[in-house]
Amino acid sequence: MYDVIVVGGGSAGAAVAARLSEDPARRVLLLEAGRDWRADEAPWEVRTPNPIPIIHKREYQEKWQWPDLLSRRVAGQESRFYWRGKGLGGSSMMNGQIAIRGVADAFDEWAALGCTGWSAKDVMPLFSVIEDDLEFGAAEGHGRGGPLPVYRAPPETWGPIDRGLRDAALASGYPWCADLNGPDGEGVACYPINSRNNRRFSTNEGYLEPARGRANLEIRGHALVDRVLISDGRATGLRVHIEGQGTHEISARQIVLSAGAIHSPAILLRSGIGPADELKAMGISVARDLPVGRHFFDHPLFRATIQLHDKLRPIDPDTRHTNCCVTYSSGLADGGKRDMILIAFNHRGIGNPGAIGAGLFNAYSRGTLKLASTDPSVDPVVEENMLADPRDMLRMMDAVKRLAVITSQPALSGIADWIRLADTDLTLPQAAHLPDHELDAVLRRETGDIQHAAGSCRMSGFGDANGVVNPDGTVKGISGLRVADASIMPSDCRANTHFTTVVIGEAIARMMVR
């Protein structure tokens, strides 16, 4: 029997499996639905610092993602493909590599919601543990020697829209920020990314490669978990479909679900853990009535397309899509510190136009995730419900007006044939001058997401029935079962979610070995 089975080898799961297996007396099995791959075997689409091909090309979606997973971003839109990594490294092997820390105030909010052990003083030191910051590692509050390199591309390597956004935002009065992960990390900045020697560095390379020689760590790829086996209120194992080997039941003393904000809740629902009415409607016996899938959120993003002058268009397939961003506090609608981000997109695929975008880093709208079938090979139904909360719409409207000012600066207007919204064909100044009800309608058409799924197995205080897991990651009312990934976020971390998700894995692993 295994001591622990970890489900999912992504941003959090790789950290959990690696940390728990540091004790040679603890037998750990890591199950990954996608392929088990080695760093020295990684093909170009996984190595390149440009994530656009692996995200958008169908052949790579089928190889490295869940190709049939859809979500509806905003009510009234059609459901579209939702990219999530499938393979060791999870979404860290196909995301934008962004390594931004969550905001200290956000973690203090988690603690205020009853999540003891998740305040800024508890969480922020773990960011130093996981990083190998090549530029600021020796500075107070930073780290060197951790499993994940943090790199900032020198400005001379940036793309034209990176430089345009930087110069236009500075000219518009936004301050320069040398270190976005510093205590006052807000302003015009270079993205910190997980990269080494101009190649992506996922949690597979950072955590699992160094741990592979351990006799007590077993890694199995192409292992699709159907459900958790539960007896008398205790998790006893898993029912798993292993490619080429059929279906097996595997026993363990403890189970940790780190399958991500889409598939961890789906596994719980198939296991009879979730809203009782939904489970009964699917013919699933109820093991525990909990609000699984009821708190889903992502970061809304709208983009204006930028058609660069011919001579400025990138031609190197390894050109990064973005190096520069602007983070700021809107001062509106309970946004809090660093609730917004503006993003440069040098291209959306080599040969295609670039863009400039604005997104929420503190989203209040909440969506749902529900089963479409009890078959584990069928992805769940995701309704993101973006912009439903008026606090989100108000700040997105303000961002349109900010971008209208920034894109009028010569640093951006001077490099473009045109800049306009993709669906409505409006320029940003035109959109900014619309009456509120018309701008509302435009944003509902134009808004997508940043692929930062979170919140679907929400953490709440011990004894608080409004959550799915307790502050130690244990599923409420079920012994021997935890969740450790972005799905447990009780509210927004106000950053790209990858780095905070790794920290969640580190934190839960530490709680398990105390």
Can you say where each PLM-predicted feature lies in the sequence?
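N-terminal redox-cofactor-binding region of secreted/periplasmic oxidoreductases
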Residues: 1-514
